[in-house]
Amino acid sequence: MISVIKINNIIHLLQDKNTSNWSNDEVLSKEFESLGFYISNHPLKDFEDVLKQYNVKTFKDFENSSVNESFIAGTVMSVKEKRTSKGNSFAVIKFSDLSKVYELYLFSEILELNREYLIEGKSFLLTVIKDKENQENRFRRINVRKIVSLDKITKLNYVNVEIE
């Protein structure tokens, strides 16, 4: 649990005149570094136009919908790489969007293509698909089919970018 003192220290730090020249990215980075979450804004807010263009759902909306495949967006909070018993690499990525914090698995093929870009604080557009329901009908695993940096999309003319 975060103490009121810690939050007050963060607020004081953000109001300090030495931080007035900080970019939005720097402020968000310091918030996340200090608190473990974003308090003044969220990095995905900078990409609202792109998210609308691709009809991106929040993770919570996708999770609760009957739709099996969708675009979602997320900002990386942490990356933990692991190996399967067969030696294949995979990563458990903790993401944050405007609805919640969630974890997704990136398996070796997708991980190998994107490892160098998976940095805390970076935001991504993900194509996700719900796996078949398990036998007890309790949950459906959500798999990442494709992941693209939102910075990369915005540097291109995103109207012409195709995400498969």
Over which residues does each language-model region extend?
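Noncatalytic, beta-rich nucleic-acid-contacting surfaces in large DNA/RNA-processing enzymes
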Residues: 1-164
